[in-house]
């Protein structure tokens, strides 16, 4: 697989040199590959959000490097803007970031700042709206007139419109009903398949992680303590619980059956 991002010995310390100094990520290394769906889980404060904000240069490492396509993203700080076009980050509750007069203009904001032609911007707006599950009739509406789920889709479309090589999502389904969650995840998978993009998803929903990701990283105290396929990671249920994490409901049932002497596969998790 083609490696698209490499994190080398990343450390990030907040408030360095002050009494409030706190290490959020410690000497962490990982690789992200084109076309893969990577999940990141960890208890609150484990360093997940700090890590993903380094991947597109929103935070600068205290030490270590972030390589995009083999090049250090901070080698030339003047080019960091281009990194953010290639690595799109969707924050938790991104609908609060909508600000334009129409949904169309909001989605077009990123492509416009890339200096693209009007025709190319129009193509990207409409295609990204389609990927995000928005119909054409919504594009001329005010984003503030949309439902909560539609706002979430518009915000995701605004990042997808830049056609990033890597799409990073922090709790993309938070606050949505079950149908809305599954619909959003399907849209993300559709984009990944069409663009062969890497997708990185942070989530507290173990069911969503188990059902969607190819590879999973477990973070604790600022570093990766477990990495592997979901079947491999969730087979260590006791360790995950000791970190304050849940495991998928089906995994809990199967583990209990194993404890009762029933022969069930340890790798089943959904």
Regions found by a protein language model. Give the residues of each.
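ABC ATPase NBD Q-loop/coupling interface
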Residues: 65-82
């Amino acid at each position: 697989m083609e490696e698209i991002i490499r994190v080398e010995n990343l450390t990030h310390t907040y408030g360095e040199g002050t009494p409030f100094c706190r290490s959020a990520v410690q000497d962490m290394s990982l690789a992200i590959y084109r076309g893969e769906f990577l999940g990141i889980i960890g208890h609150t404060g484990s360093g997940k959000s700090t890590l993903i904000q380094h991947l597109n240069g929103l935070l600068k490492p205290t030490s270590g490097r972030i390589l995009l396509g083999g090049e250090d993203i901070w080698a030339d700080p003047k080019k960091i803007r281009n990194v953010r076009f290639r690595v799109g980050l969707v924050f938790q509750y991104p609908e609060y970031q909508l600000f334009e007069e129409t949904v169309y203009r909001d989605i077009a904001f990123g492509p416009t700042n890339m200096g693209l032609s009007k025709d190319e911007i129009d193509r990207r707006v409409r295609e990204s709206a389609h990927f995000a599950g928005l119909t054409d009739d919504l594009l001329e509406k005010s984003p503030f007139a949309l439902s909560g789920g539609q706002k979430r889709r518009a915000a995701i479309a605004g990042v997808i419109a830049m056609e990033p090589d890597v799409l990073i999502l922090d709790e993309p389904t938070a606050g949505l009903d079950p149908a809305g969650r599954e619909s959003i995840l399907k849209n993300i998978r559709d984009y990944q398949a069409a663009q062969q993009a890497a997708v990185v998803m942070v989530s507290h929903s173990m069911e969503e992680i188990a059902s969607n990701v190819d590879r999973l990283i477990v973070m604790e105290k600022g570093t990766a303590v477990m990495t592997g396929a979901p079947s491999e990671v969730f087979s260590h249920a006791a360790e995950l619980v000791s970190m304050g994490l849940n495991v998928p409901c089906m995994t809990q049932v199967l583990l209990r059956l194993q404890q009762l002497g029933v022969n069930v596969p340890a790798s089943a998790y959904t």
